[in-house]
Amino acid sequence: MKILTILGARPQFIKAGAVSREIAKYNDIKEIIVHTGQHYDSNMSDIFFEELHLPKPDYFLGVNGLNHGAMTGQMMEKIEKVALKEKPDVIMVYGDTNSTLAGAIVGSKLHIPIAHIEAGLRSFNIKMPEEVNRILTDRVVQLIQLRIA
């Protein structure tokens, strides 16, 4: 099994650290990590990967500093290229960022099952970009919706 993990923000790195350590215990599961660059700062990003023993990303997309539409669109283009090349069995997304939404939409369009960590959480404030991302991501997720407490 091949899992394409999409990350872009520091809280996602923290959660992914625990999940990636579990995935690494299984020889028949290969995880490919994609860092979108959404909240990229080399010092902050690198320290999270080192201290959480998270494998270095296989792909760094370098998408940041844009408005929501441009950022999500560029992420979708780049994630789609990676997904078409790697042919994952599952795309795993975390939380409620633009990276989350971009990965979920790509999985949906390419008919790749999506695992969404933190699915179903709501603030009920539709004015928040994160709430829009939560609702849209949950709508396209067909396979797995997980909450990690």
Annotate the PLM regions.
Residues 1-38:
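N-terminal subdomain of nucleotide-sugar transferases
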Residues 58, 89, 142:
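Conserved acidic residues
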Residues 92-110:
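An aromatic- and histidine-rich active-site surface loop
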Residues 112-149:
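Active-site-proximal region of nucleotide-activated glycan assembly enzymes
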